[in-house]
Amino acid sequence: MKTLDINQIKQYLPHRYPLLLVDRVLNWESGKSITAIKNVTVNEEFFNGHFPHKPVMPGVLMIEALAQTAALLSFLTMGQKPDDNSVVYFIGIDGARFKRPVEPGDQLKMEVEILRNARGIWKYKATGSVDGQLALEAELMCTMRTINDASPAAGQ
């Protein structure tokens, strides 16, 4: 079983607090799949406004957590770490469905599988679950570019 702790994750993802949304990798297999977790606590910044009377993790951040997990798998598969001259763009999402809320105290378990990698576009099947219950699912697409080649309109 191949695992990564938070210090190892930070070597592969440029994200930092408050947007680093992967706490641990439980297992990964190069070119195939990865399983990771996000421990959701009441101290998350977003709970101050989403929603004070009923805290729920925003869907867009659940998708971002899956996208970060997918990016980790891609970097691990390529055997490289990001550098100051590269950027990974999240370029597409299909079939996103939210099945249950993610709340303080939950552990979001993220499972991502590579569907294909063609012409620099990575496509993944991604799911997130809490206590064995499906919370969200989506197909994600990402690409990596060098800073000099990255068009401002290519992504966020």
Swiss-Prot record:
Subcellular location: Cytoplasm
Gene Ontology MF: a single term: (3R)-hydroxyacyl-[acyl-carrier-protein] dehydratase activity
Residue ranges of the TM segments: none
The UniProt record lists the keyword Cytoplasm: yes
Major subcellular location class: cytoplasm
Reactions the enzyme catalyzes: a (3R)-hydroxyacyl-[ACP] = a (2E)-enoyl-[ACP] + H2O
One of the protein's GO biological processes: lipid A biosynthetic process
Pfam families: FabA (PF07977)
Cellular component aspect of the GO annotation: cytoplasm; membrane
Enzyme Commission identifier(s): 4.2.1.59
Keywords tagged on the record: Cytoplasm, Lipid A biosynthesis, Lipid biosynthesis, Lipid metabolism, Lyase
Active site: H50
Family classification: Belongs to the thioester dehydratase family. FabZ subfamily.
Protein's job: Involved in unsaturated fatty acids biosynthesis. Catalyzes the dehydration of short chain beta-hydroxyacyl-ACPs and long chain saturated and unsaturated beta-hydroxyacyl-ACPs.
UniProt-listed HAMAP family: FabZ (MF_00406)
Record's protein name: 3-hydroxyacyl-[acyl-carrier-protein] dehydratase FabZ
